[in-house]
Regions:
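Auxiliary Fe-S-binding modules of radical SAM enzymes
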Residues: 1-51, 55, 82, 86, ...
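Short cysteine clusters
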Residues: 38, 59, 63-66
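Short functional micro-motifs and their immediate structural scaffolds
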Residues: 43-46, 64, 68-71
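Alpha-helical elements of the RecA-like P-loop NTPase motor core of helicases
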Residues: 64, 167, 207
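Glycine/Thr-rich phosphate-binding loops of Rossmann-like dinucleotide-binding domains
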Residues: 62, 106, 165, 234, ...
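Short, glycine/serine-rich, charged loops/turns that create anion-binding
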Residues: 59, 102-105, 137, 203, ...
Length: 286
């Protein structure tokens, strides 16, 4: 695979990483930071933050860009909501991000588990805000209603790539379905900030990127993240290019000009990386 440019190389404090990793092991929790081999793991762990990955670390889908294992998942752990709340309390988190491996094997896609976890966090950590990064729950409005009723401050569902590449890169997902879920959440509760993100480097064009921005803005999306695709292995979707930092600055300016309330656009930006900054920027909560 192509050698990474200098701006994608990261360094971090191993001791700080080990402390958070040990807490996660003790509470039998997964983080997307580790499961998805996130390049920001070191920085986030060093700041005692993490994105909790609910419902196990095995996914029922096999997106060609993703490093999470595909297979048959275990049943949900009934202790996980409380364990996540304990970890959030011990880390002193002001903003908690919850994500999951896609669980198409569950009737509600894991929505009830998300809701229980939100409630557990609110009970232990009053004042802590919560962001959910769910699957599309197969577009099921009843499942989405369960998450909406728990009222996360931010509802995130990543569109991942442009319409033209969607089926090749995410064969079990659907571009229109993702947009439909984002639209539905905003219609049901306009006070919830909606968020999505996509990657650069999969083979998209600038014109397609602009069209994607228009599509997600049209369904009321408030927050947008734009990041560099990093090919996990030779078996994954082939990297088309490394976009330069100046490209990401240009995409950010374009998105802000179109009307997004907050845009995080950088090579190492990820949907949950420094997620609290979007809330600070929109002045809704802080």
């Amino acid at each position: 695979m192509e050698r990474k440019p200098e701006w994608l190389r990261v360094r971090y404090n191993q001791q700080a990483v080990s402390e958070v990793a040990e807490l996660m092991r003790d509470l039998k929790l997964n983080t997307v930071c580790k499961a998805a081999n996130c390049p920001n793991l070191g920085e986030c762990y060093q700041k005692h933050t993490a994105t909790f990955m609910l419902l196990g670390d095995v996914c029922t889908r096999n997106c060609r860009f993703c490093n999470v294992t595909c297979g048959k998942p275990l049943p949900p752990d009934p202790d996980e909501p409380e364990n996540v709340a304990q970890a959030a309390e011990k880390l002193g988190l002001r903003h908690v991000v919850l994500t999951c491996a896609t669980r198409d094997d569950l009737p509600d896609g894991g929505a009830e588990h998300f809701a229980k976890t939100i409630c557990a966090i609110r009970a232990r950590c009053p004042g802590t805000t919560v962001e959910t990064l769910t699957s599309d729950m197969k577009g099921d409005h009843a499942a989405a209603d369960i998450v909406i009723a728990a009222h996360p401050e931010v509802f995130n569902l990543n569109i991942e790539t442009v319409r033209e590449l969607q089926k090749a890169v995410r064969p079990q997902a659907d571009y229109a379905r993702t947009l439909g879920v984002l639209r539905y959440v905003k219609e049901q509760d306009p006070s919830i900030l909606t968020k999505t993100g996509f990657m650069v480097g999969l083979g998209e064009t600038d014109a397609q990127i602009s069209a994607l921005m228009d599509d997600v803005l049209a369904v009321g999306c408030d927050i947008l993240t734009i990041s560099q695709y990093l090919q996990p292995s030779e078996a994954h979707w082939k990297l088309a290019r490394y976009a330069a930092p100046e490209d990401f600055a240009r995409y950010k300016q374009l998105a802000l000009a179109k009307g997004f309330r907050h845009v995080a656009s950088a090579p190492l930006a990820r949907s949950s990386y420094r997620a609290w900054e979007a809330l600070e920027d929109t002045h809704d909560l802080y």
